[in-house]
Amino acid sequence: MCIIADSVKNVSNTKIASFHVAYSVDNNKNMIPSQLIVYAAKIDSTVSSNAIILPVYNPGNDSSKIIPLDLSNFSDFFDKLSTIYGRWFIDDNKIQALSYRNGQISVTNSILQVYTVGDYRFSIMPSKKYFNNLDKSQLNVDPRSKISIDQHNNDYSFIVFQFYQKGVIDITPFGYLCPTNSTSQIVPTIHGHPENNDFMPMDMGINISRMQVFSSIDQFNTPIGGRHNNNFENEAEFDHEIYLLVKDTISAGKSTTQDVIDINNLLKKITHDYANNQIRLFVPKNFIPGKIKITGKKPNRNIFVGPNNYRFMNDLLIDNQK
């Protein structure tokens, strides 16, 4: 599930990793706290070039804080990650709230630069106001994909990853680093693409990690039902497996030394960013792993993750119109 720039028949088998990490650049000893997002999916695209658009919570809209990573030699990232996560199982049901502020920025008329990383071309929109600044000569982005983008507030940036295959394809993992809160994360799960088909509801399954019990998201009060605001889909069909690694600032000793070593060894294979700078990633010494399986029709929102819970967020413009 994601925002797709042009027409697709189906998006399924979505896998997302969302980790608290720290990273260094070119062997610098300075460690920078960040959130790592890695994404993969199966997409049935009806056009020969298409793009995945992911929202990035980025107050202030400084696009230099979003760092795409080269995962071109790491096609088995989720296979290896799944093996490690197989050792952890547990649940929890607490809810946390987030408050937001809307930043104000000015928009220039300049075309956004297009870069290459691994198997993708990409461009970063500092905010939704920059949609018309995308280089349409290099990126195939249908104007209708703007519907889901426009629902976000001004604290979100957007990263556009272009791929070049038609038909049913397994999107190779791509990833990026972005700003994060030290104890929570926002995972990009919002959906939207041109020419959507009607959804067939399915049951939701939840498979949680060993450290915490996350709530069933059906319990939350995110509005569900129908289409609103220029055909924005207020609910969407999910087929998601989300791997979480949240910094544990409350209690020590939940993640073992071997846990930390195993995840750090996995991340060692991510070695460079889009500008060919050498990148080294490290996970916190104490962390809470989580694994969430979400299927069926659910609120079409991004997901907030804290140490003890996860929930669909309520921060879209449509949520302020109730």
Swiss-Prot record:
What protein is this chain from? Uncharacterized protein L629
